[in-house]
Each structure stands twice: as structure tokens, then as C-alpha cells.
From Swiss-Prot:
Family: Belongs to the WrbA family.
GO cellular component: plasma membrane
Sorted UniProt keywords: Cell membrane, Flavoprotein, FMN, Membrane, NAD, NADP, Nucleotide-binding, Oxidoreductase
Main location, first listed in the record: membrane
Compositional bias of kind Low complexity: 49-60
This protein's name: Probable NAD(P)H dehydrogenase (quinone) FQR1-like 2
Record InterPro entries: Flavodoxin/NO_synth, Flavoprotein-like_sf, Flavoprotein_WrbA-like
Co-factor remark: Binds 1 FMN per monomer.
Region (Disordered): 1-60
Length: 273
């Protein structure tokens, strides 16, 4: 105890120091992946794991079975898109997921709740029938999710909400608990809900016990480009649709691809024994 009641470090044990973390490199996808935590080194011996700290002493670790991943990890990109804006992000997001070894993405549409007559009156384009509709029961086969939807008054569209409402049986059994998920959105204007549409959707994950995975600022310099209008936020990728005629820019699509890559890295990390 020092003068004035302040604590001073022991002479025998110096406080640990940490080095500077890696910087952001826009041309290197590896730096956009989650930063590895190496304070403790974990080694696998047969079917048991042992954690060894940096001081060279062995400490007890939770006994686990070293699971051998024989098939690719699956990320379901589940979306609703009336005019194709969310769909364009979804397809680019799949590219990002598939770029990570050992992880693959599958695109799914949620069912339309509007009648065909209403859809035609709204002049919505024909849906891509090569992308199948998904049922709630199929969600259990995924290791992670990326949900995409347009905004309606700052919240997810009714079609996506109806799909989440159909997952009651999964909620009852907590079948999706512990699985990571992220969001991507489409709004008409800059103030139309790029952030609120995502964070109001988090409640769907909470009740299922799922893990929300935002992208933060892992996209690096692309998150700070101000030379042109750009959708997307720390919550996830996004696109501005305007009056419906505006298409996603390359920056918006690149952010979607990055989110797919980032989510794949997270899912892969969580699957490690």
C-alpha cells in the first residue's frame, strides 16, 4: 500500500502489457475476420483440451470432445425482398460466406403474405423461383443465419415478422438457442430506418436465445466513405432503394459481401472444439 492509500505493483510480479492490435487493411480480407485472442493457448490432446497460460503453467480446462467437422458449416441467408434490393445484398452476401473454407451459404425466401393480385398492383417483379421458400422447421439445420428484409415504419416488413411468428415450436424447445445471426436491410431514405430496422429485430433473436452478431466497423475504411450516399451501419449491411429505381452501389454490395465473410468466420470460430 503506497502513501495516500494507493496500490503499487509488486516488485516480483510486473503488470502484463499488451501490444498494439493489427490495423485495418482494405485489401486483406483476413484482417476483417475476428481478432484472435491468444492470452491463453489451448492444445488438443486426444479427446481432451488443456488450457496453458502464457506463464507456462497448466490450468484446468473444461473437458470437451474434439469434434471433427466432416461436412461444411451451414449459414442460411433468409430474406424477404419485394423489389429486389434485399435480394441483391443476399446474393452478394452468399459470395462472402462461400469464400471462407469449410462454410457454405444457402439462399432462402420467406413466404409472401400478400395476394398475387396485390403484388401485381404494386408492380413488384417476379420472384426468383430458383431460390426456395423456407419453413420454420428447416431453420434447425443451420449453424448460423443472416436475415434480410426491407423496412416498414422503422421495423421489419410484415412478411418477415410473419415468418418469425411461425417459429413458435422452435421457441418452445429453444432449438435455435446459441446460434449466431445477423441482419441486413433496405430502406427508402437515409432516415428511413437503416439502424432501427435492425435493432428492433433483435428481440426476435433474444426470445430464441440466439446470438446477435453485428459487423461493427470491421469493414474498415469502407464504413467511413462519405463521397456518396451509402446504406449500411454497424448493425449490418444495407441499401437505399429510393423510389424503387435505385440499385445497390458497389460499396453497398461490398459491405454485404464483407458481412457474409465476417459471419462465416464467426460461425467457424464457434464450431471449434
Amino acid at each position: 500500500m503506497g502513501k495516500g492509500g494507493g496500490c503499487v505493483p509488486s516488485k516480483k510480479k510486473k503488470p502484463a502489457t499488451t501490444g498494439d492490435g493489427p490495423g485495418i487493411d482494405d485489401d486483406n480480407d483476413a484482417t476483417n475476420a475476428p481478432i484472435q485472442i491468444d492470452d491463453d493457448q489451448t492444445t488438443i490432446d486426444g479427446d481432451r483440451t488443456t488450457a496453458t497460460n502464457t506463464g507456462g503453467t497448466t490450468t484446468p480446462a473444461i473437458t470437451t470432445t474434439a469434434a471433427k467437422i466432416s461436412s461444411p458449416l451451414k449459414i442460411f441467408v433468409v430474406f424477404y425482398s419485394m423489389y429486389g434490393h434485399v435480394e441483391s445484398l443476399a446474393k452478394r452476401m452468399k459470395k462472402g460466406v462461400d469464400s471462407v473454407e469449410g462454410v457454405e451459404a444457402t439462399l432462402y425466401r420467406v413466404p409472401e403474405t400478400l395476394s398475387q393480385e396485390v403484388v401485381e398492383q404494386m408492380k413488384a417483379p417476379v420472384k426468383d423461383l430458383e431460390i426456395p421458400e423456407i419453413t420454420a422447421a428447416e431453420l434447425t439445420a443451420a449453424d448460423g443465419f443472416l436475415f434480410g428484409f426491407p423496412t416498414r415504419y422503422g421495423c421489419m416488413a410484415a412478411q418477415m415478422k410473419a415468418f418469425f411468428d411461425s417459429t413458435g415450436s422452435l421457441w418452445k424447445e429453444q432449438s435455435l438457442a446459441g446460434k449466431p445471426a445477423g441482419f441486413f436491410v433496405s430502406t427508402g431514405t437515409q432516415g428511413g430506418g437503416q439502424e432501427t430496422t435492425a435493432w428492433t429485430a433483435i428481440t426476435q433473436l433474444v426470445h430464441h436465445g440466439m446470438l446477435f452478431v453485428p459487423i461493427g466497423y470491421t469493414f474498415g475504411a469502407g464504413m467511413f466513405k462519405m463521397d456518396s450516399i451509402r446504406g449500411g451501419s454497424p448493425y449490418g449491411a444495407g441499401v437505399f432503394a429510393g423510389d424503387g429505381s435505385r440499385e445497390a452501389t458497389e460499396t453497398e454490395l461490398a459491405l454485404a459481401e464483407h458481412q457474409g465473410n465476417y459471419m462465416a468466420a464467426i460461425v467457424k470460430r464457434l464450431a471449434q472444439p
